[in-house]
Structure formats: C-alpha cells, structure tokens
C-alpha cells in the first residue's frame, strides 16, 4: 500500500491561495526539508466545480504534476467538506438543522447534512471526476475523503431516516417502547411516526439517554454511509490505493470504532489543548492504533505552532513539535503531517500555525 520507502512527512497544502512564484519557492523549500507527501485540495470544491456539472481541473493538474516533478507524493482529498455556495443556494436541503431547530446558512465547512441525497449525489460526482483523472497518477499515494466528519443534523430528512433506522433496529414499536422504557413519564409510542429527534425543542438530548444514544448511533451509521458514497467511487477506478478520512481525535460525536471499519487506514488530527497532560495525548494515539487491530495509522494533522480555535492558543515551546511527532511515531503512526504547509494569508484559519 505504501509507495515511499520511509515515513510520509508533509501536510496540507492549499496552492489555490498562492501565485506561481510562491508555489515554485514552496517546492524548493519542501525538497530542502525532506517533504515527501502533500495533502490537497481539501477545501477547493468551489474552484473545481464552479457550477453544477462544470469542472475545472486544469490548475490542479498543473500543481500535481509540479509536485511529482519534485519527487513528492500526494494524498488527494475529495473537497466535499466545503460545498460550493451554488449547491447550498440551489439545494438548501443540503444544509443542516441544528439542535435548536434552526436551519444553518452557507459558510462553515462541514456544514452539510450527511443524509441529504442531493449532497451525496454531487459529492459522488466530483469524487468520480477525481478518480477518472488521478486514480493511476504516479504521484497518488492515498485518497483522503472529505474532512473531519461530525456534523449533527435534525432536518426532516434525518427525522424520516431516524424512524426507518429504528424500525430496522427494533422491528416493532413494542420492542422500541421496551428498550427505551417509555412507560416512565408517559412516553409510550403507538407508531414509529411518533418518534422525534432529541433536540432542545423536547429536551430529550438531555433527559432521555436511550433516545440520545440511539440518535448518536444513527448519526454514526449515516456518516459511514456518506463516507462510503465516495469510497466506492474511488475504489472502482483503482482498488490498490488506500483510502482514509481524518478524525478529530478523542470525540464522542461519532463511534469511531464503527466508522473506521470502512477505512483502509486510520487517520486522525492531533491538536492537544494547553492543559492536556501528556498521557491523554498518548491515550488518543493508542485508541487510533487499536481501531484497526494494531495497524499503523496516519497522523493527518498537527499544528506547527499555535491553533486558532481554542480559548487559549499558546505558541509551542522550542522542540515541542518534534516531541509530539516522535510521540505519534512511537505509538504507531507511519505518517507525520501538518496543517498547513504555508500559513494562510487570510481567511478563517489565518492564525492557525
């Protein structure tokens, strides 16, 4: 599965931010630093598909060829974590509804409903364009599907699918009543159509752990389906290329042990909080190593310095990045990647790294 003869070392690269002179200088610096893997183009869906079914890959062709000419492999990411504005505007059903019942607007990345059929249709379509174009490119080391799954949604589509999921899981409303112990507080159901999602509108997310647990299981299954929607397309064109997605470390949003059953290799992002003790980071590494029975894993992201999203974003001390990287490799990572290779000039993550 592995093309390089040593640990993959590199990170996310977003060349659509830079001019040709900057990119050429980056290639020189990458070679000097011993970089041998770049992940791209994670957030570039809007540039690659400026309108529905209209694709522009020429700029990406040029970048990938330039990277390969410098002896660097690529981890190609389907850019489906950040849908274009035209998709959200034309098909508002792709946007999630939050736990307060509010329809979210376009803007944030990972702001899509994993159960939206239109989202899955367009995500599979651009994944196929990637696969047709790059599945046998000599630079391709692995695929990276979307980015940091974990958005909850409470839209009508999710409501309907949750009822179907419960029907399949329990078979009858009588069994559902038994498992959820609905006799307490007079919550007895007479039909699956009476089931509602656990939101702030009914406070079930706080006061009914059985409903909340099943909802979280449902979200995990729905997310796995959404991932497989792209995975199957990519595998069809070249089954030899491993496929992963990056998980956000130790989170309870998704059952990672279920999600990783569908991955060829585990990937996760290591962003320790300032007050995290070293053993907590070590535990996260061990969890990732254990998800595929001890198989080595991909450290898909870590910051070369500060984050930009924690309450207190401290600078790393001299040598700390090296120690964090060594810790990952000691726990079984065979890939050490950063976000990102050149700090953004502007935008949402300007102060990251």
Sequence positions of predicted segments:
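Surface-exposed, active-site-proximal loop segments in enzymatic domains
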Residues: 44-58, 86-117, 157-159, 206-212, ...
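Boundary/entry segment of secreted carbohydrate-active catalytic domains
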Residues: 1-22
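Short, well-ordered coil/turn segments that N-cap beta-strands
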Residues: 4-9, 34-36, 68-74, 136-141, ...
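Polysaccharide-binding and catalytic clefts of secreted carbohydrate-active enzymes
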Residues: 100-265, 269-283
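Aromatic-lined substrate-binding rim segments of carbohydrate-active enzymes
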Residues: 24-104, 128-131, 229-237
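Conserved, mostly hydrophobic/aromatic
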Residues: 11, 30, 38, 67, ...
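Hydrophobic targeting/anchoring helices
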Residues: 105, 244-353
């Amino acid at each position: 599965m592995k093309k390089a003869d040593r640990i993959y070392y590199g990170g996310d690269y977003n060349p659509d931010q830079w001019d040709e002179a900057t990119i050429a200088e980056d290639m020189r610096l990458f070679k000097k630093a011993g970089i041998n893997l770049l992940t791209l183009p994670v957030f570039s869906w809007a540039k690659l598909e400026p309108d529905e079914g209209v694709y522009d890959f020429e700029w990406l062709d040029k970048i990938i060829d330039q990277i390969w000419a410098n002896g660097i492999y690529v981890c190609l990411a389907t850019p489906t974590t950040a849908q274009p504005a035209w998709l959200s505007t034309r098909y508002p059903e792709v946007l999630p509804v939050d736990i307060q019942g509010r329809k979210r607007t376009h803007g944030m990345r990972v702001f899509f409903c994993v159960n939206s059929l239109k989202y899955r249709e367009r995500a599979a379509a651009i994944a196929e364009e990637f696969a047709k174009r790059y599945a046998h490119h000599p630079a391709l080391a692995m695929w990276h599907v979307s980015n940091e799954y974990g958005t909850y949604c409470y839209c009508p589509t999710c409501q309907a699918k949750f009822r179907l999921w419960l029907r399949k899981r329990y078979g009858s409303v009588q069994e559902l009543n038994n498992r959820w112990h609905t006799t307490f507080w007079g919550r007895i159901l007479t039909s699956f159509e009476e089931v509602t999602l656990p939101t702030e509108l009914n406070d079930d997310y706080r006061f009914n752990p059985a409903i909340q647990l099943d909802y979280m299981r449902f979200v995990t299954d729905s997310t796995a389906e959404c991932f497989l929607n792209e995975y199957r397309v990519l595998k069809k064109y070249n089954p030899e290329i491993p496929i992963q997605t990056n998980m956000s470390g130790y989170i309870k949003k998704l059952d990672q042990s279920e999600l990783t059953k569908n991955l060829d290799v585990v990937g996760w992002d290591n962003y320790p909080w300032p007050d995290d003790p070293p053993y907590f980071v070590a535990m996260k590494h061990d969890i990732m190593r254990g998800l595929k029975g001890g198989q080595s894993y991909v450290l898909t992201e870590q910051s070369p310095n500060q984050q930009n999203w924690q309450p207190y974003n401290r600078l790393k001390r001299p040598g700390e990045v090296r120690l964090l990287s060594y810790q990952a490799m000691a726990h079984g990572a065979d890939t050490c990647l950063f976000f990102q290779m050149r700090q953004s000039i502007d935008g949402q993550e300007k102060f990251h790294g």
